[in-house]
Design a protein with these regions (language model features):
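Conserved alpha-helical segments that form or flank metal/cofactor-binding pockets of metalloenzymes
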Residues: 52
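Acidic, glycine/proline-rich low-complexity segments that act as flexible tails and inter-domain linkers
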Residues: 1-37, 49, 58-63
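C-terminal binding/interaction regions
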Residues: 3, 66-80
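Short alpha-helical scaffolding segments that buttress acidic/His motifs in well-ordered protein cores
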Residues: 19, 39-46, 74-79
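An internal, amphipathic alpha-helical element
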Residues: 37-38, 69
């Protein structure tokens, strides 16, 4: 986790808890499996130029069973 987020989490624990709850609820709601959700987040991170998010979501997508080819395609979708 980037140092800025670590400081934010320590300074505003209730806000961080609410954010984490929203994030988890959004991730768990609906029919998409974990791999698909993480591949979507890979594409979003690539589109926004968020290197930290890209690294984190690529790792999570791979752990959820995404192949390297699927991961690269998700990145390409974010670029296009």
């Amino acid at each position: 986790m980037p140092q800025t987020l670590t400081r934010f989490r320590k300074q505003f624990p209730e806000v961080w808890k609410a954010y984490a709850n929203l994030r988890d609820t959004c991730t768990d709601t609906g029919p998409l499996d974990e791999k698909t959700v993480e591949l979507i987040k890979v594409g979003i991170s690539a589109a926004l130029g968020r290197e930290g998010g890209l690294v984190a979501h690529v790792s999570r997508a791979r752990k959820a069973g995404a192949s390297p080819a699927e991961t690269y395609q998700a990145i390409l979708q974010g670029m296009g």
